[in-house]
Amino acid sequence: MAAIHQKFGRSIPLSAMFEYGSIRRLADLLRADADAPAATPLVSIQPKGKKPPCFFVHPAGGNVLCYYDLARCLGTEIPFWGLQAALGEGGVAPGSIAKMAEIYLEAMLDIVHDGVPILGGWSMGALAAFEMARLFHQRTGVAPIVAVLDQIAPDLTSDSTSGSEDLTAKLFAFANKVSELVGHDIGLSKELLAASSMEETNSLFLDKFKAFELAPEATRVEEFQGFLKLMLDHNRITGEYEGGLYPGRVLVFRAEGKMSGSTSGPG
């Protein structure tokens, strides 16, 4: 998408990458006079099938590409949708998990008019999916199954950051998470981050993301700074979420391996 914007000056939503799933079809879209499909939280990753659809909420950072392989493994009998955060101009993160869940539930109900969906998510997305299920139950009296991928109970989560922590501490915590993800120290020390302006910090992180192939080479600093702000906002609301009672089934899926520093298990 960054390369398309750089080359053609056109911004298209992630949903178009799945809907127009070939170079030829994307070219037709770019040639058309009509604008690209309107931005929406809903991303149709695998639209086929007549079984109850799955709706998986993005983790912190807002992207649902992490669910592509999962949707593929589930086959073509189960429609699979992602709920992706808005990352464009004016795309501000909701102020709480509860508000996020409300927005995403409304988007889901635009296309789900009967039946009971399956809700799920990875990391922060699991909390938003759980809250969506609570709201769905409050409205309909029906409790959907919730699939929780590698996310523990809110009061035990290692992702939380207190309001008293300064920006440097939050950025350093994020740098440590990236180091765990790639299996190497990415070299962003607390001292370096403290001495850097926010503009410099965006460039530092983007350079590391490109070096470890976490971001395309064509990604611009302007695009990345929106992602970094969204990541910090998501980490904040994750730490503030307290959850609540839910009468439905919650299925917890955990990876066999564990990153260093992660909490031992779900609460």
Describe the predicted segments one by one:
Residues 1-21:
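Phosphopantetheinylated carrier protein domains
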Residues 24-267:
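A hydrolase-biased, glycine/serine/histidine/acidic-enriched motif that marks catalytic-domain neighborhoods
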